Amino acid sequence: MSIIVNQIVLHQLVKTSQDENTVQLKTHLRDELLPITAETEQMMLQLHQEYQNKTKAYGVFQETSNFAQILNRTLENDIDFLAFSHQSAELLRQELGKYSFANDGTLILCQYNFLATDYLFIALLDSRYSMLVDENLEIKQTHYLDITQFDIACRINLTELHLDAKSTRYLTFIKGRVGRKIADFFMDFLGAEEGLNPQVQNQCLLQAVSDYCQQADLTKEQTQAVKKQVFDYCKGQINVGEEIVVTELSANIPTLNEQSFVDFAVSQNYGLEENIPPVRTALKSLTKFSGSGKGITLSFDAELLNSRIFWDEATDSLTITGLPPNLRDQLQRQTKE
């Protein structure tokens, strides 16, 4: 798959001092855009692919967003991309300096097209140090941009923003390992608030599937078969990096009580989006029971309940018949010691 880079620029944020709660940063700005070469396009393709695999949250611009105002001026050709990047770098410097985790970094801003969709990608990349051997077989230190490990990044779907300004999913940002501070920081920088919540959408989808089966008075086995079909479709979408399309999902499961799943979901007002970003951990509950606590972790296929695994609610206990061989072997070895 190819990527078309339209405009790209790099700037640097340099840490000059730090106290207990804040960091002083300065900007080192380019005075012209980067030339578009095979190297820049290859870098952006890799960044795009890495970003696709990150855990992301969704946001929308607030009416008072300074960043959105600058972006709109750029899209309307009131200012050029270089000026936009300079103003964005300054906004980023101001917001990032409020957090103790702030550090040096290379800021990349790129407007590109992938699969007929226009994007604006913004990321703060770290530099890494390594060693190289030159033509004289001498060992020297070098540093390079780390384009595989990054936590501070966002992407705006410019095509979706243009077609539907009320969309709740045109803006995404990484939910970084540093925790909530990363989300707060990017929300402040972008002047954004929470948009689509994939976890909530997945939970609503699961509830809709359960209710759909219940209203048709399906047996336990029939219900589990439908849930397995739902899970298989969703797993397939995850494997190819696509979202759950509710109409496609509906076509992959039986029509119950002469009503398709999509019609049922609409009539019952579950608030499902037409396309839902899949959350793997949430979808697992379609076919598995799992839980952990007090030193115990359990996970088993839902179809085993009341066949090999029995729950006694009164005594709050599970009875398991036919233990996994490796677990049985461990228990036998332990009791013989």
From Swiss-Prot:
Q: Which domain of life is it from?
A: Bacteria
Q: What GO CC annotations are associated with the protein?
A: bacterial nucleoid; cytoplasm
Protein keywords:
Cytoplasm
Keyword Hydrolase among record annotations: no
Keyword Cytoplasm among record annotations: yes
Provide the primary localization. cytoplasm
The entry's localization annotation reads:
Cytoplasm, Nucleoid
| Molecular functions (GO terms) | double-stranded DNA binding; single-stranded RNA binding
State the similarity comment: Belongs to the YejK family.
Q: Which NCBIfam families match?
A: PRK00378.1
Q: What is this protein called?
A: Nucleoid-associated protein HSM_0096
Annotated organism of origin: Histophilus somni (strain 2336) (Haemophilus somnus)
